[in-house]
Curated annotation (Swiss-Prot):
UreD, UreF and UreG form a complex that acts as a GTP-hydrolysis-dependent molecular chaperone, activating the urease apoprotein by helping to assemble the nickel containing metallocenter of UreC. The UreE protein probably delivers the nickel. This is Urease accessory protein UreD. Required for maturation of urease via the functional incorporation of the urease nickel metallocenter. It is found in: Cytoplasm. GO terms for cellular component: cytoplasm. One of its GO terms (molecular function) is nickel cation binding. InterPro entries: UreD. Belongs to the UreD family.
């Protein structure tokens, strides 16, 4: 386990497009939060960055900050080498603030692997997204409350999460979550409904055809419907999909199923699962 000494770590990335190639033109970091080198698993049009947190977990009092800027017509994909672990706390709160900005025509894919909250963890997560005209944002988030593989449940602790998405300055998505371990709210239908894993996929851009959504929903339910609950909703400018269950592995398959289906329609390119997800 990581040291009990609180850490402050910040990472700032900037991507720009030139002659059809997306490059990482700025990479600044302070503390143990970094990107080793840009990757191009599907050609030079898409730049992939794997964000690494060497300590391997976040302890009470730690503060992480990530800022990503995608320039006009650039395409960046941000992922992680493994699950992010938030360790138990004796009182202090660990924090993470993510700010993502895509300029006109830019594409930003936010695809970290699972987030695991250990029992007694106290965590505050801020996630802000700013999108300019004709930009596209896709995100996949898998939250695991307790280490279910070890028979651990989230009986104590507190998780707070604020998520906002703005398109051309207009707020199109806002979600505020506050969960106390072992509380009645965790069993409520408006929260986790007694489940230990919550996964969310969000995509901005033009609405998908109704037939395409029906096909995506059918396949997602086939994968996750027996062990959990799957829902997909097309809003005016956002597609939102959710999975509630008790298996992070099933949640991963459901999220990737949805991503594989909508990425070719929206971006005109197949979904290539980040290599780090397969290790």
């Amino acid at each position: 386990m990581a040291s009990d000494s609180p850490l402050r770590a910040h990472l700032r990335l900037k991507f720009a497009e030139s002659s059809g190639i997306t490059r990482m033109v700025e990479r600044d970091h302070h503390g143990p939060l970094l990107v080793q080198k840009p990757l191009y698993p599907e050609g030079y049009e898409v730049c992939q960055a794997v964000v690494i947190h060497p300590p391997g977990g976040v302890v009470a009092g730690d503060e992480l900050g990530i800022r990503v800027h995608v320039g006009p017509s650039a395409h960046a994909q941000i992922t992680s080498p493994g699950a992010t672990k938030w360790y138990k706390s004796k009182g202090r709160t660990a924090r993470q603030h993510v700010y993502l900005h895509a300029e006109a025509g830019g594409v930003l894919e936010w695809m970290p692997q699972e987030t695991i909250f250990f029992n007694n963890a106290r965590v505050m997560l801020h996630h802000e997204v700013e999108l300019e005209k004709d930009s596209v944002y896709m995100s996949c988030e898998i939250l695991c409350f307790g280490r279910t593989a070890f028979g651990e449940s989230f009986d104590s602790g507190e998780i707070k999460q604020h998520t906002s998405i703005r398109q051309e300055g207009k707020l199109v998505w806002f979600e505020k979550l506050r969960l106390e371990g072992g509380s009645k709210a965790m069993n409520g239908r408006l929260a986790l409904a007694g489940r230990a894993v919550c996964a969310t996929f969000i995509m901005s851009g033009k609405p998908l055809p109704a037939q395409a959504i029906d096909l995506v929903r059918e396949e997602a339910v086939r994968i996750g419907g027996e062990s959990g609950q799957v829902g997909i909703t097309q809003l005016k400018s956002l597609l939102v999909a959710r999975f509630l269950g008790d298996s992070s592995e099933v949640a991963r398959h459901v999220m990737l199923c949805i991503w594989r289906a909508v990425r070719p329609i929206t971006l005109g390119r197949p979904a290539i699962v980040p290599r780090s997800w397969n290790t």
